[in-house]
C-alpha cells in the first residue's frame, strides 16, 4: 500500500490525491499540538511548520518550560497544579491550561488554594492546569523567527495591552479590530535597551534549536526590571 490521501469515486474506486506539500495554517487544537503532523508523517506527506515532536512540546507549557529550564534558559518557574502542590511564592499567581494558547482559560488568583479550586472547577482546565508567579509589572515582547533557508529573526514587537486589564487577553489579541490580531495595538519595533534586545535575540535563537522550531514561528517573552523570561 502506498501512503497518501485518496478520493473515493464510483463503485468505491480510489484515486490518489497528488499532494506535494501541505501548508499548515491551523490555530490550536489537533492542528497545532502534533496530532495533524503525526497524520502527515504516517501518510508520508511533507508539511510546513514544526514536526510532530516540536508541535507537541510547543503546545505543552509544562514540557516547554522544563526543556528551557534544563538548558539553563531563563524561564519563570512553572508548576503543575495537584492536590498536594506547595509553593514558596506568594500571590498573586497566574493559572493557565497546561495545553493550548491565545490566553484562553488564563486567570489571575490571589493564592494557591484559589488556584487549586479553579483547576478543579474550570472546564478549560480539565486536561491539566499550571501555575506560576504573576508579574504585574512585566511587559510582553514578541519576536518572529524563520528557519529556512537559514535561521533569521524579525524586529522585536511589544504588544500594548489595556492598562486596566491585568493580562494580554484573547479579546486584546483578536477582538480589537476588523483584522483580528493584525488590528491589535503594538509598538514595532519595541524601544528597548541594546543589552535587552541582544539578550532576547540570543534566547530566541536558542529556543529555536531546543524546541525544534521549524518554518515560521513567534516566540513570546516577559521583561521587567528583574529580568527577561
Predicted segments, located by residue:
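Conserved hydrophobic "DFG−1" position in protein kinase catalytic cores
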Residues: 7, 133, 145, 221-223
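Active-site nucleotide/adenylate-binding loops and adjacent lid/helix of ATP-dependent enzymes
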Residues: 12-16, 55-140, 147-150, 198-201
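Conserved metal-phosphate-binding beta-hairpin within the catalytic cores
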Residues: 208-229
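Glycine-rich phosphate/pyrophosphate-binding beta-alpha loops
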Residues: 28, 103, 161
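Phosphate-binding site of ATP-dependent enzymes
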Residues: 112-202, 228-229
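ATP-binding N-terminal substructure of ATP-dependent carboxylate-amine bond-forming enzymes
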Residues: 1-53, 57-63, 82-85
Amino acid at each position: 500500500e502506498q501512503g497518501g490521501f485518496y478520493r473515493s469515486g464510483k463503485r468505491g474506486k480510489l484515486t490518489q490525491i497528488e499532494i506535494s506539500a501541505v501548508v499548515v495554517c491551523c490555530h490550536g487544537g489537533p492542528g497545532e499540538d502534533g496530532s495533524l503532523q503525526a497524520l502527515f508523517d504516517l501518510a508520508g506527506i511533507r508539511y510546513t511548520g514544526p514536526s510532530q515532536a516540536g508541535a507537541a512540546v510547543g503546545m505543552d507549557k509544562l514540557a516547554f518550560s522544563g526543556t528551557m529550564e534544563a538548558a539553563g534558559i531563563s524561564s519563570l518557574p512553572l508548576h503543575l497544579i495537584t492536590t498536594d502542590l506547595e509553593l514558596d511564592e506568594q500571590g498573586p499567581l497566574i493559572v493557565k491550561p497546561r495545553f493550548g494558547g491565545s490566553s484562553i482559560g488564563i486567570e489571575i488568583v490571589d493564592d494557591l488554594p484559589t488556584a487549586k479550586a479553579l483547576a478543579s472547577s474550570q472546564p478549560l482546565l480539565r486536561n491539566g492546569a499550571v501555575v506560576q508567579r504573576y508579574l504585574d509589572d512585566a511587559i510582553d515582547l514578541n519576536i518572529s523567527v524563520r528557519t529556512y533557508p537559514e535561521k533569521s529573526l524579525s524586529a522585536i514587537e511589544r504588544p500594548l495591552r489595556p492598562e486596566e486589564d491585568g493580562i494580554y487577553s484573547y479579546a486584546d489579541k483578536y477582538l480589537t479590530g476588523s483584522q483580528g490580531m493584525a488590528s491589535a495595538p503594538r509598538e514595532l519595533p519595541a524601544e528597548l535597551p541594546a543589552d535587552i534586545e541582544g539578550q532576547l535575540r540570543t534566547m530566541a535563537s536558542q529556543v529555536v534549536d531546543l524546541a525544534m522550531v521549524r518554518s515560521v514561528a513567534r516566540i513570546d517573552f516577559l521583561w521587567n526590571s528583574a529580568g527577561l523570561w
